[in-house]
Each structure stands twice: as structure tokens, then as C-alpha cells.
Amino acid sequence: MTFSVQHAEIHFNQNHIPVSDQFDDVYFSNENGLAETDYVFLQGNQLWERWITHKEANFVIAETGFGTGLNFFAVTKLFREFRQQHENHPLKRLNFISFEKYPLKITALLQAHLAYPQFEDLSAHLQRYWPSLILGCHRIHFGETTLDLWLGDVSENLPQLGDYMNERIDAWFLDGFAPSKNPEMWNDDLYNLMFRFTKPNGSFATFTAASAVRKGLESAGFNVTKRKGFGKKRECLSGLKIQSKSTALSTPWYLAQPAKMEQQDVAIIGGGIASLCAAISLVKRGAKVTIYCEDDSLALNASGNKQGAFYPQLSDDNALTVDFYLHAFSYGRQLLDWAIAQNIAFEHEFCGVALCAYNKKSAVKLAKISQLGLPNEIFQMLNAEQLSEKVGLPLNCKGGWIEQGAWLAPRQFVQNAFSFLEKQGVIIKTSQKITALSQLEKGWELKNMQGQKYCHEVVILANGYKITDFVQTEKLPLYPIRGQVSQIPTSENLLKLKSVLCYDGYLTPANQLKTSHCIGASHVRDNVDRHFSEQEQQENQQKLQQNIAQPWTQDVNTSDNLARVGIRCSVRDLAPMVGNVPHFEQQQADYYNLFNLRRRKQPIQSAINFENLFLTAALGSRGLTSAPLLGETLASIIYGEPLPISEGILHNLSANRAWVKKWLKGSKVE
């Protein structure tokens, strides 16, 4: 498996316009690229006029060929002007999906952006979060506009929008290099997928009027119109989807279903990192969020450690899980930057993470990761001398280096970020153990231990291993894992530690006061005892000293017995869960014979889930990395917006995946 893409090879012509060496074509008009964008795409799709009459909260544009981002900048600026002039309009958000096979190098991007200083704030933000060369979707927020930049071939990525995106796109910018220069992109598969994903009365616009393109779009189902071309071009095309075609769902058992809500009233059960990240993404969309936390304070369970590592899980044999973590890592950094910009205080250090090849098994794992072709800023193998230099202390083994890794203080982050959200209107109820959920005609009733009842339109379960305490979720294959993290005093040697050190455990650099480190963590499945264990305390010390046989490790001393225990939530395949809560009895009735239904090519209905009930779960030991993208994915599903992950990743994170895998094989689910 590989996750990398290639950079574009370009040069700049005498007009300072970027030209593709791969396709021998300009990125935008030599005459006036911005004027061409306005005429061909903004006017061609009649965006302003359609926004005026739009009745939904978001508008979705998809584009083939991101290039320098000129089209995106132009439409984002136009949308900002629209929002300023129509503050009370129902249309609040713009989603822009773009596909780019060969992304520009950052140096070329910077040079190309010099031509349009009027977009300086947008281009600077894009440059800051310009993605690594990782295949798939990279979500970047620009206020009320969200960019989903899909890197890789559009013929591979566009189908990954999946069943969920059927008839959800309002307008298309059919851009890219000319059909004569890039015939592979301009084909019937593209046009048919465009039609499938376009809303009724949705539109497209393109700079070309090539006969093959026109006929292909008409054959797909679009009503195509010729209009005057831009500049020296005689004609260009635009069109509408007037009539829908029924499209069979490819995986109806995994279909994500948005919430039905009028008041945007959302309850989240849980007080940790999963709950926080869902709340952040919901608040940005205007939701009214209420948090129900069982403890008397937030972040007292798995999110309560003093220090935690931030880096992706790359050693999984499941390519979709690795793919998720690569994108979660990138998106998580964006969220941390947002928190810092909001002056949310939390200890952190972007110091890198070292993964030690401390035995044969770990060396094999790291060798497999090195074959994924990841960019150096994500992962690179280093010899013992190089890794020791990064870590700041001598090591006797080679290992992997994650340059963009970090540590942060989870409890500080969660508590202070929730305090920030509270000022934005989020209601936080502590000492509220919700014991039962009852479905209402519209929404859910929550009942606490004292018998008090609360009603909300939408409920999200984000309470870790206790998610299965409800009758609606008791069949989910989740289990608890006890983890004890030791807090140790620093020393002259340990103060030299410059990065997070991972082996069969982990050791963090000193905290910001330079007084202590965290070392952990024990791993005891199906154990929810939160009392201190002297044995696990000693094991945390012994693992380091056995795995990293260096004299400096003798400075590690856990005898003060300072530690905290958290209970993590996990699942056998180690991938998180996010999305709708599946209705087990209904799905069992519909899918127990799924193997034969597929074999006989009989119709299969969409999955029945509990309406307006969602979860984000099984974050395991990587919650700091996974929670931000899980929260954003969940908010996108709830609001019926484009997702920041591929259909394949969504299936891999679906709560019913273990059941479906059995039903697809003809096996029983107990």
C-alpha cells in the first residue's frame, strides 16, 4: 500500500503564469486568470443569484483541478461579500471540494500567489496548511468556507465521495488542463459521477466547448448550453441537472444518515477529548450544545493525563486505519493551532516523536512503515546516531522519526477549551450520570440517576467505554482498557530529552516547569479498576529500562508512586467508531441473509439506525490524534455536509462494521 502523490513539475512563462511541464498547458489564462474565473465559473454557475434564493444552510461546490487555488480564492471572496450583505440569510456556509492530481510545491505556490495580492490573507492561510503529499482528502477551514482538497487522480478520488454524496453538490467548476492536453481526465466516468453527485437543478460550468465534452455531459444527463467564451475563446459550456436518475447504493449497510433537526439542539454525553472535539465542530456550525459529564469535573477519565503524545498510528496492517490516522494527524494540528490562536492555555511542545526499534518485532513494524512512501515530515527512518541526536539522549537502536509529532497536556487542553466553549454558549452539566435514553417523536429524552429528564433533538454518545451502558448500544463490541501513567521527577540526564520517546511504552520530555515527566502506560483489558497499582508502576519503569538499555534510563524512578489511572475504550480491530448508532435488531433482521442477497443480486435496503443518535468512540490510546477529525466527521454527518474522509475510511469507522463483516460472509452475529 502507498499513500503518497507526486508534486507538479512546472515553470513560469514570460507573463509569470505557471505552466505544467506534465501537460504543457497554463494553469490559468495568460490574459487575466481572475477575470476568466469570474466569467466562466462564478457567472457560469450563476452563484450570486442562486445564493440569494438558496434555502439551506450550506452550498457545495466541487472542482476538478485545484491548481494554484485561484478559483477557490475568488469564490471564497465572493461568498464573504454575500455573507456581509446578507447576514440573516439562511445560507451560512460554503463547502468547496477540489481534486488535484499533482499539487504544486510550496515554493511554486508562493510564487504563483504573488500575482494576486488581493487574496493575501487566503493565500497565506492555504500556504500555512498546504498538505503533505498524502493521497486523499485534506480539510482546511477558512472561516465560513471549508476547503476539502483531495490529492491524487480524480478518477480514483471522486468515487470515494461515495453513496453519502449522491445528489449533494450544487455546482461544478469543470476545470483542469485542456481536454487535448489531458484527455485521461475528460471521460464518461467523470461526467456520470458528476451527474450522480449533483443535486436536482444543480449546475456545472467549464472553459471548454469541445464536442466530446459536450456530448459526454449530455449523455450523462445534463442539459448543456453553449455560451460566449472568455477572451479569445469562441465558446464555453454550462449546464443543469434537470432530471434525476435513480442510483443503486453500492454499500447501503454503511450509509451515513444526517440528523433531522429544526433547533440544532445537541446533547453530548461525555466530558473528555471526544466530546470536546465534537462540540467544537458543532459550535462552528451554529449548534446549541449541552454537555452531560458523569464526573464532578471535566477530563477526569482517559483524557485526564498531565502529558500525552500526539502522533499517528502507522503500524496497523489495515490500510484504511493508517489512512485515517495520517489525515487525523494533519487535521489535529490545525485544531491545536486554532486553540492556540483563541488563547486557550495548555502546555504543549511540537518536539517530534521517536519510535524505537527496540526488538525484532518493532523493527519489522517500522520497516513496513518505511515502505509506505510517506513524506519525511510525516515519517523517516533514522539510524541510532541520528535518532539519538533528535531525542537528545543516547539510544542503542535505530527507529522512526515523526517530525511533526508533539506532546500536550490533555486535561488542561480539554478543561480550558471547554471553558472557552462555555463563553460561546455551550452549556456544561457536571455530576450528571445519564442512565437511560428514550426516543421521542422528535429527538431524545435523557434520564439521569436522580430521575431528572432532559430533552434534546440530537444526542451524541462520547462517554468512552460506558457507551455500551445504554440498551441502544449494548451490542457494540467495545471493551475497556485500564492504563496507568506514572509521573516521575526529572533529573540532569532526563532534562536532556528533547522529544517524545516511544518503545513498548512512552516517555515524555519534561513538562514546562521542568519538574516532571510522564511514563506509561499499562494496558490491562477488561479492567475498570481505577485504583493505583504498584505492580504497574514498576512495570512502567522496567519497560523503559529493558527496551532502552542505556545508563541514563536508571534515572527513571517511579518509587514516589505518583500516577493516575484512566480507562480507555477500544475495539478488536483498533479503529475508532464514528457516525450513526446502528439499530442492532433491525439490521440483524435486514442483513442476517446479506451474503445470499448479494449473491442473488436482490435489492438491499439502507441501514436502519437510531434516528438522531450518534457516537464517537473507541479512541483507544490515540485520542489526542483521532478526536479532532472524528468530531469534524461527526458534525459533517449530522449536518448533511461533505465528509472530510473517504468512503472507504467511513466504512472502516462505522459502528456496525464488525456485524456487517460477518453478515457479508454468511456468519451469525450473536
From Swiss-Prot:
Q: Where in the cell is it found?
A: Cytoplasm
Q: Name one GO molecular function term.
A: tRNA (5-methylaminomethyl-2-thiouridylate)(34)-methyltransferase activity
Q: So which domain of life are we looking at?
A: Bacteria
The keyword S-adenosyl-L-methionine is annotated on this UniProt entry? yes
The answer, when asked if Flavoprotein is one of the entry's keywords, is: yes
* Record region (tRNA (mnm(5)s(2)U34)-methyltransferase): 1-242
**Can you quote a single GO CC term?**
cytoplasm
Cofactor(s) the protein requires to work: FAD
One of its GO biological process terms is: tRNA wobble uridine modification
Record keywords:
Cytoplasm, FAD, Flavoprotein, Methyltransferase, Multifunctional enzyme, Oxidoreductase, S-adenosyl-L-methionine, Transferase, tRNA processing
Q: Which reaction does it catalyse?
A: 5-aminomethyl-2-thiouridine(34) in tRNA + S-adenosyl-L-methionine = 5-methylaminomethyl-2-thiouridine(34) in tRNA + S-adenosyl-L-homocysteine + H(+)
Q: Pfam families of this UniProt entry? A: DAO (PF01266), Methyltransf_30 (PF05430)
* Region described as FAD-dependent cmnm(5)s(2)U34 oxidoreductase: 269-670
Q: What is its EC number?
A: 2.1.1.61, 1.5.-.-
What the protein does?
Answer: Catalyzes the last two steps in the biosynthesis of 5-methylaminomethyl-2-thiouridine (mnm(5)s(2)U) at the wobble position (U34) in tRNA. Catalyzes the FAD-dependent demodification of cmnm(5)s(2)U34 to nm(5)s(2)U34, followed by the transfer of a methyl group from S-adenosyl-L-methionine to nm(5)s(2)U34, to form mnm(5)s(2)U34.
- Homology family: In the N-terminal section; belongs to the methyltransferase superfamily. tRNA (mnm(5)s(2)U34)-methyltransferase family.
**Cross-referenced HAMAP family:** MnmC (MF_01102)
The protein depicted here goes by the name tRNA 5-methylaminomethyl-2-thiouridine biosynthesis bifunctional protein MnmC
